[in-house]
Amino acid sequence: MESEPADWESASGGVASPARRESVLSSYRRLWRTLVGLYRSHPEVLWFLLAAAIYRDGLAGVFTYGGIIAKSTFGFTQDDVLVFAIVANVVAGVVTIVSGYLDDLLGPRRVIMGSLAVLVVMSLLIFALHDGGPVTFWALGLLLSSCVGPAQSASRTFLARLIPKGREGEIFGLYATTGRAASFLAPAMYGVAIWGGAFVVGKDQAGYWGILGIVLVLVLGMVLMLRVSDPKGHITDLD
């Protein structure tokens, strides 16, 4: 009896079936059509998705690499880093709650831009005062952490006001997808900044230069946000 290699390979998971390959390709084509439709009809939605994907990766980088910089540059012990992380998360949570009132008063776009601006300034101060010791990092680091939550919360509020009625699920799905797609930026720029700093201060002393990479990511997100204005209510049609 002759075997049926195509069916056997498909059943065993060795080779994807044509139908499965077509399904994957169809998904990418559908995604591309959605992005093109956004760009043509309401480009501000697409610009915000791009801007948010970038600066949200910078926000993630603040928490990811903050402890490393605290330990390698500011003399924190491992226990100090753990205590700081707990306090920073509590502070971030409290400030996020308070920022909800600012969101209603000023609008989410201003909260986003203000939070990112403070993050950039505090990051540059941490870089400039890298020899200030633990007290310096506690003061600047907590101010830095306090702006992460408001930026994240206001981003979701802003998107909810910007997207069209009836397309909330689809656009929030794109919001999550674009965020994952940009997740390489902060690690890459952090590494590049340290690599560049090694030529200036030496490899062993260049750890704090990584924060400049995070700053570049945040600034790029802010620049893209300049293309997005405050929404005047829901967009009613994307087609």
Stretches found by the model and what they are:
Residues 192-218:
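A membrane-interface helix-boundary motif in multi-pass transporters
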Residues 95-108, 194:
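Helix-to-loop junctions at the C-terminal end of transmembrane segments
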Residues 1, 212-239:
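Multi-pass alpha-helical transporter architecture, strongest
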Residues 150-164:
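Intracellular juxtamembrane helix-capping segments at the cytosolic ends
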Residues 64-81:
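Short amphipathic helix-loop junctions that connect adjacent transmembrane helices
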Residues 3-50:
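Juxtamembrane intracellular "pre-TM" segments in multi-pass secondary transporters
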Residues 117-131:
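C-terminal ends and interior cores of transmembrane alpha-helices
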Residues 135-150:
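Hydrophobic core of transmembrane alpha-helices in multi-pass small-molecule transporters
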